[in-house]
């Protein structure tokens, strides 16, 4: 599936990556549509400290996962795609590219 992110860039979520996400993080299976929402309406976007071509999109949901943020990890490039998605306890270090005020 092809989506647009907050920056109007095209992001792909392949079937292979979706299968990886639900295998490693089965609690996310009912929340595929939230991945799209995180990309479009993030609370934070950070650049990874490990890979400058990786962006970290965070969104807090009060109604699921005890308010912990959902993190969608995207590899940017000629073909940008979702690497993974999971629930996290912390906002990782890195340059903040955007923050909801």
Describe the function of each predicted region.
Residues 1-101:
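Ribonuclease/tRNase effector modules and their secretory precursors
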């Amino acid at each position: 599936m092809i989506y647009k992110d907050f920056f109007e860039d095209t992001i792909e979520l392949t079937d292979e990556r979706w299968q990886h996400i639900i295998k490693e993080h089965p609690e996310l299976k009912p929340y595929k549509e939230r991945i799209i929402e995180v990309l479009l309406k993030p609370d934070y976007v950070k650049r990874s400290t490990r890979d400058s071509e990786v962006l970290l999109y965070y969104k807090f949901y009060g109604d699921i996962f005890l308010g912990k943020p959902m993190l969608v990890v995207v590899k940017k490039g000629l073909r940008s795609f979702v690497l993974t998605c999971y629930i996290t306890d912390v906002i990782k270090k890195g340059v903040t590219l955007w923050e909801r005020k």
